[in-house]
């Protein structure tokens, strides 16, 4: 069964280098402006294609997330239905990214599943078609499929590739799961940050409108930010809970990481404007 196993398909994390909430639409979704950048810290997926059409997932997450709710299986099923293929796959997930951390782990896993199976099943969908399927699974999935650092606005689906500084990051992972829906439903969330042009945004001070509310509701996030900001410019990514400090070199990040107090966990990663998934695809 595993002789045709295609291995080590990366599902990278992302950071929101800024996240501005510009308003709320009539349908309840929020108008955002944000900048996505990938980091070289990833989940990894293996795939073994079959002709039976069956889809199975092996993961230490099985006890945490029901298969019916798993975005990996939803992505594979969506690709089957969209293309009409009779092929299936056995999938293995090596989970390294924290869930509910604001670094896109579930969305990235779904994107890697779509990109890898489109290649392995030879269903030959375009990137735009894959992104359309991805958007039905989650607002962040298309950026992982496109594979380039991007400025996004709307609900996050309008993407413009950008070249952001590829800094080193120390990312702290508070042991708390932040609900995105809960954050965006918070009546005290700022929703009136003025919309700016991309040029203005790229030259202005960056912030995350969700950060003050999350820090107030989750002391673990506030603690991580308070410690990290003593050493480097620091912000929360997405709706949290992860926070990141920005460094020019790996050595600087490692120097601060070595001082990490008990009770805080994290990792060091490099920002990259081209997704490791896009690079993996070119190796075939």
Swiss-Prot record:
Swiss-Prot/TrEMBL keywords: ATP-binding, Isoprene biosynthesis, Kinase, Nucleotide-binding, Transferase
Keyword Kinase in record: yes
Protein EC: 2.7.1.148
Pathway(s) the chain acts in: Isoprenoid biosynthesis; isopentenyl diphosphate biosynthesis via DXP pathway; isopentenyl diphosphate from 1-deoxy-D-xylulose 5-phosphate: step 3/6
Residues annotated as transmembrane: none
Domain of life: Bacteria
Active-site residue list: 14, 140
Catalytic activity: 4-CDP-2-C-methyl-D-erythritol + ATP = 4-CDP-2-C-methyl-D-erythritol 2-phosphate + ADP + H(+)
SUPFAM superfamilies referenced in this protein's UniProt entry, alphabetically: GHMP Kinase, C-terminal domain (SSF55060), Ribosomal protein S5 domain 2-like (SSF54211)
Coiled coil: none
GO BP terms in the entry: isopentenyl diphosphate biosynthetic process, methylerythritol 4-phosphate pathway; terpenoid biosynthetic process
Function: Catalyzes the phosphorylation of the position 2 hydroxy group of 4-diphosphocytidyl-2C-methyl-D-erythritol.
Protein name according to UniProt: 4-diphosphocytidyl-2-C-methyl-D-erythritol kinase
Biological source species: Shewanella loihica (strain ATCC BAA-1088 / PV-4)
Gene name tied to this protein: ispE
